[in-house]
């Protein structure tokens, strides 16, 4: 679904990924679980494209629900995969999820359903990424859409948001989300539950990196889009802590 001009949203609840379209050229942002590949292919066809049209794959971070079918797309298209340097090693591994946080909260019905969807969509059959390129904070990636990298560690060491200044769009990954993966509740901008973050204190501090961006449409890794100033988004997120 095209949610903004040149930005297509793909979803298998509660997991989001996106395609940036620029002059007919496509960048895939995140890549769900392995089992979501067929959903992605069908979604591409619905907008008049094929998998071969993907020119680059960029990851907000190296968790299995964001890189699940990235290697399959890379092999099918020879499109390069890009990830922040601090998550580069993790991107070459399998089973990268905050397992302790998920399993310790599996008594919650929604978290249990998230685990069930992970297993049902091939989390244990993830093909590791065999070739990936590192980027650093502040880079402007030479891929369709020219996203700006904002390193915002805490959820993972290499967590980033991708900023598209000309479009007023921030693809926030799991820096800020709008759905609680513990309860399933929808809401405004929020930091993922503390048990899901590699460094929860850092995940909270890092929000200030986004404050000066101004008004954007924020596209999270989990939940619905949100529009407003990032200063307001940060205030809302901190009010939920």
Regions found by a protein language model. Give the residues of each.
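Conserved beta-strand hairpin/beta-sheet module of binuclear metal-dependent hydrolase folds
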Residues: 1-47, 162-178
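Metallo-beta-lactamase
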Residues: 33-35, 88-153, 197-198, 202-215, ...
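Short glycine/proline- and charge-enriched loop/turn segments
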Residues: 48, 97-102, 183-194, 240
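Binuclear metal-ion centers of metallo-dependent hydrolases, dominated by the metallo-beta-lactamase
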Residues: 225-241
